[in-house]
From Swiss-Prot:
This is tRNA pseudouridine synthase D. Its EC number is 5.4.99.27. The active site is at residue 79. InterPro entries: PsdUridine_synth_cat_dom_sf, PsdUridine_synth_TruD, PsdUridine_synth_TruD_CS, PsdUridine_synth_TruD_insert, TruD_catalytic, TruD_pseudoU_synthase. It comes from Geobacter metallireducens (strain ATCC 53774 / DSM 7210 / GS-15). PROSITE patterns: TRUD (PS50984), UPF0024 (PS01268). Residues 154-364 form the TRUD domain. The keyword Isomerase applies. Responsible for synthesis of pseudouridine from uracil-13 in transfer RNAs. Belongs to the pseudouridine synthase TruD family. The gene is truD.
């Protein structure tokens, strides 16, 4: 369903290699949308974190400063792997109080006042510095050739496999939810015994598959809280899969639906990979300057703007209110929905799960790319707009390595 197969730079050999062997191999720094003005009730703290997720960092900061976690603002989510530098906003604090903090895994690099709380999405993009180990001897030359193509034509704006969860099936759970197939949704949630680590976890899934619900509940490890909660409901009402699935946290249910959207989008990227840098009649084109979309009626007239990276074709993050393209591109997207057995109205779910949908550019610009070598391997530096993933670049550069 994800459709991630081909390379935009298929004619150029990759570097191979692996990433994230140490924290310093993967460094991400947010590019702010604006800088703190120097006055106001919020302190904008630039933090550097190692081996800590954004949400864990917020918990530690809130606890240390006696704040509610909800009061702490942030612009983007970052995972625990690697070194990340990002800004958080802290209300009713003095900069010197924040600078004095000493927390495991977190360094405070600066603290300045600003008037408003930092909101999700309030960033321009991210700058990456990534070391790839175990590459071929001419890796720098290979990487430079690939980066030059990506800089000219754009980076395929894939979500990639990291969007689909540890077992790679989050999007399938979302699809089952849209289809109202709650038995399938629960089966997928429980997982595949071949894809988990730990004998108890594996045995718990196998017990579920045999219909031994109480035994499965007993065997599931403590970190599998969602699975245990769902099975607890099934023990009481074995045929009520929809009711059992309601035990899943609403935020997690929304994540499954979002993963389904992402997989369908990635399928469109794959289908249109060869023409990512051109717009077709009926396309909904993306203006990179402001994120607005417009219907393309004269592709020849718009071609220079696409060539100069002012505009790009878009793909769907399907939803009940998403604008559909016309012509061949509209037919492609409608056929994709039909093949999955869903329609736009399927996304109009109750219980706060409604997905309105939006357009997303099929390609994004690659900012200031550089490739160099150090004693440990190949070093790649580049920037991407917010919402785009470094794995899309690494996949093209490494080709067959491990860009995760």
């Amino acid at each position: 369903m994800s459709g991630e197969k081909r390379y935009l730079t298929a004619g150029l050999p990759g570097t191979g290699g692996t990433i994230k062997e140490t924290a310093d191999d993967f460094v991400v720094e947010e590019i702010p949308l604006y800088l703190p003005c120097g006055e106001g009730e919020h302190v904008y703290a630039l933090i550097e974190k190692r081996g800590v997720t954004t949400l864990d960092a917020i918990r530690r900061l809130a606890r240390a400063l006696k704040l509610s976690e909800r009061d702490v603002g942030y612009a983007g989510m970052k995972d625990a792997r690697g070194v990340t530098r990002q800004t958080v906003s802290l209300p009713r604090m003095k900069p010197e109080e924040v600078l004095a903090l000493e927390l495991p895994g977190i360094r405070i690099l600066s603290a300045e006042r600003h008037r408003n709380k930092l909101k999700l999405g309030h960033l321009a993009g991210n700058r990456f510095r990534i070391r790839v180990r175990g590459v071929v001897s001419d890796a720098v030359a290979r990487a430079e050739a690939i980066l030059a193509v990506l800089e000219r034509r754009g980076v395929p704006n894939r979500f990639g496999e990291q969007r689909y969860g540890a077992q790679g099936n989050s999007h399938l759970i979302g699809r089952a939810m849209l289809a109202g197939d709650w038995c399938a949704a629960v089966d997928l949630l429980m997982g595949d015994p071949a894809k988990v680590t730990g004998e108890a976890w594996r045995s718990a899934i196998e017990a579920y598959q045999r219909g031994e619900l109480e035994e499965s509940q007993r065997l599931f490890p403590g970190h599998c809280r969602t699975e245990r909660d769902v099975i607890q409901r099934l023990v009481k009402r074995p045929d009520d899969f929809e009711g059992a699935f309601r035990a899943v946290n609403p935020r997690l249910r929304k994540l499954y639906l979002s993963a389904c959207q992402s997989a369908l989008f990635d399928h469109v990227v794959e289908a249109r990979l060869d023409s990512l840098d051109t717009v077709q009649e009926g396309d909904l084109a993306w203006k990179h300057a402001n994120g607005a979309c417009f219907l393309v009626t004269d592709p020849a007239a718009e071609a220079p703007r696409a060539e100069h990276f002012e505009i790009s074709p878009t793909g769907p993050l399907f939803g009940c209110r998403m604008m559909m393209p016309e012509g061949e591109e509209g037919a492609l997207e409608r056929s994709l929905l039909a093949a999955e057995g869903v329609e736009p109205a399927s996304f109009d779910l109750p219980g706060g799960l409604r997905m309105e949908g939006e357009r997303r550019p099929l390609r994004v610009p690659l900012g200031d790319p550089r490739a160099s070598a150090d004693a440990d391997g190949l070093v790649l530096e580049f920037s991407l707009p917010k919402g785009s993933y470094a794995t899309a670049v690494l996949r093209e550069v490494m080709k067959g390595g491990r860009p995760d």
